[in-house]
From Swiss-Prot:
Top-level taxonomy: Bacteria, Pseudomonadati, Thermodesulfobacteriota, Desulfuromonadia, Geobacterales
SMART domains recorded: DHDPS (SM01130)
Location relative to the cell: Cytoplasm
GO terms, molecular function: 4-hydroxy-tetrahydrodipicolinate synthase activity
Origin species: Citrifermentans bemidjiense (strain ATCC BAA-1014 / DSM 16622 / JCM 12645 / Bem) (Geobacter bemidjiensis)
Name the UniProt record assigns to this protein: 4-hydroxy-tetrahydrodipicolinate synthase
Pfam families xrefs: DHDPS
Main location group: cytoplasm
CDD domains: DHDPS (cd00950)
Gene: dapA
Protein's pathway: Amino-acid biosynthesis; L-lysine biosynthesis via DAP pathway; (S)-tetrahydrodipicolinate from L-aspartate: step 3/4
């Protein structure tokens, strides 16, 4: 259902507030450059430091600006199941086409707890939902066996697999078959995951190089493996640079260097350290982005 190059879009700020004008411009930049779907309020969108009102407004602005040209998949995860249901319902009411739900963080539920959490949200809200597994940030790993149990639910359509493990993504594919789509959550293994049967990527790098990320996915889907491999290797350095510090600090700095919005992040995130900013600037010059 949700396939291709999907951007986890940044949330631009200006003097502490959401910069709606720049957000709309970023949406246009994505659509003009071939992005297949947009995820507002994900990790890259700093959802954890948005108020409930801001969270809803960011989704609303993106839905309005997209105007049905591509799917909008709203980040609606929470470590409270009740809250996740409420946020997902709000996203549906605002016109989102789907929801991306990160595994509950900090409270470290068991696999049974994870299963019940996701099932409860999927039972409560009739909206296509993407599981989001990123144990490096949440402290819990959604195992392939649990994904397989969830994959039979009609409202659970995909998983963003961001363990960085090709083995785990492959195990999900082996266990679930065509019952659920697997999307890479790490730009640097998009091509390997697609080669194993994945359907695309939810990308950080696409914030600054949407055309190239989209072209990689399109080349693979067209059977042009030589071009897909070339783009995969070409994008490795810039994709790795997006994690020179915690996401989304580097990508926001990169977008700012391109003149598209402020690099402003919200505490407890801090601006990119000067030494890392110098490294990022040099890499972006190599790619002729600035």
């Amino acid at each position: 259902m949700f396939q291709g190059s999907i951007v986890a879009i940044v949330t631009p700020f200006k003097n502490g507030a959401v910069d709606e004008e720049k957000l709309r411009e970023l949406v246009e930049f994505q659509i003009e450059n071939g992005t297949d779907a947009i995820v507002p309020c994900g990790t890259t969108g700093e959802s954890s430091t948005l108020s409930y009102v801001e969270h809803d407004r960011v989704i609303q602005v993106v839905v309005e600006q997209v105007n049905k040209r591509v799917p909008v998949i709203a980040g609606t995860g929470s470590n409270s199941t009740h809250e996740a249901i409420e946020i997902t319902q709000h996203a549906k009411e605002l016109g989102a086409d789907g929801a991306l739900l990160v595994t509950p963080y900090y409270n470290k539920p068991s696999q049974e707890g994870l299963f019940r959490h996701y099932k409860a949200v999927a039972d409560a809200v009739a909206l296509p939902q993407i599981l989001y597994n990123v144990p490096g940030r949440t402290g819990v790993n959604l195992l392939p066996e649990t994904v397989a149990r969830l994959s039979v639910h009609q409202n659970i359509v995909a998983i963003k697999e961001a363990t960085g493990s090709l083995q785990q993504a492959s195990e999900v594919l082996a266990l679930c078959g065509d019952k659920i789509d697997v999307l890479s959550g790490d730009d640097f293994i998009t091509l390997p995951i697609m080669a194993a049967g994945g359907k695309g990527v939810i990308s950080v790098t696409a914030n600054i190089m949407p055309k190239e990320v989209s072209s990689l996915v399109d080349a693979f889907n067209a059977g042009n493996m030589e071009e897909a491999r070339r783009l995969h290797l070409y994008l490795l350095k810039i994709s790795n640079a997006m994690f020179i510090e915690s996401n989304p600090v580097p990508v926001k700095a990169a977008v700012s260097l391109m003149g598209k919005c402020s690099s402003e992040v919200r505490l407890p995130l801090a601006p990119l350290m000067e030494a890392n900013l110098a490294k990022l600037t040099a890499i972006m010059k190599e790619y002729k982005l600035i």
